[in-house]
């Protein structure tokens, strides 16, 4: 999943978005060799120890999109994985938008749909429904305008893998930290048993 997400990130996101707190050589942590990193993921860097930066500068980004494309190094920590997954799945065509695209969870987003060739093009109709108490709920009706190269299941998997990779980029040591945490808790549990036994031994004459 992480390798698939890294490939999607390099092919579709790294054209505009930096991940400047992440170095290419850290991708060895997810099972990629240096040769695989060089051949498949490094399009704007010469050395495997460089950070993931793009040639697009903030000034050009603001001119093209209205705002500079944000760095994605910690986007999963600031937005959450669930939000990113929903965001990637809810783009739709909007002729009123400057880019021709809009998003259901991020209205008037400046970013066009980078994965549209995979998901295809869709339209969205938001239908409000009011109950007897006057509470209004919204129904989102999606319609396919043009199919993409992936079906719904495949695209959802692509979005999931990309989000997993962004979570990894936000904290590359996260997996090892969790493993270390489990070991530490296990050791503390053993120490607690010995400490409790020692306490009973010290206090048995008093009780």
Task: Put a short name on every predicted segment.
Residues 1-19, 182-187, 191:
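Sequence/structural segment immediately N-terminal to covalent heme-attachment motifs in c-type
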Residues 1-7, 18-32, 37, 170-178:
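Electrostatic cytochrome c docking/interface patches
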Residues 7-10, 14-21, 77, 89-93, ...:
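Sec-exported extracytoplasmic/periplasmic mature domains
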Residues 32-104, 109-132, 136-155:
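Electron-transfer interface patches adjacent to heme c in soluble/periplasmic c-type cytochromes
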Residues 152-176, 180:
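Juxtamembrane amphipathic/hinge helix adjacent to a transmembrane helix
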Residues 177-207:
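Juxtamembrane interface at the cytosolic side of transmembrane helices
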């Amino acid at each position: 999943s992480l390798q698939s997400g890294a490939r999607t990130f390099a092919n579709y996101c790294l054209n505009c978005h930096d991940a400047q707190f992440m170095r290419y050589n850290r991708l060895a942590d997810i099972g990629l060799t240096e040769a695989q990193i060089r051949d498949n993921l490094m399009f704007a860097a010469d050395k495997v120890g460089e950070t993931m930066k793009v040639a697009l500068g903030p000034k050009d980004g603001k001119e093209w999109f209205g705002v500079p494309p944000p760095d994605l190094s910690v986007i999963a920590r600031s937005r959450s994985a669930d939000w990113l997954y929903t965001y990637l799945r809810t783009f739709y065509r909007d002729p009123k938008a400057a880019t021709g695209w809009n998003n259901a969870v991020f209205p008037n987003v400046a970013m066009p749909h980078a994965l549209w060739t995979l998901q295809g093009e869709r339209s969205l109709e938001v239908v409000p429904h009011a109950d007897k108490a006057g509470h209004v709920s919204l129904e989102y009706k999606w319609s396919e305008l043009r199919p993409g190269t992936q079906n719904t299941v495949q695209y959802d998997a692509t979005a999931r893998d990309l989000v997993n990779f962004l979570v990894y980029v936000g904290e590359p040591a996260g997996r090892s930290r969790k493993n270390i945490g489990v070991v530490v808790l296990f050791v503390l549990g053993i120490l607690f048993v010995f400490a409790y036994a020692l306490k009973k031994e010290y206090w048995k004459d008093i009780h």
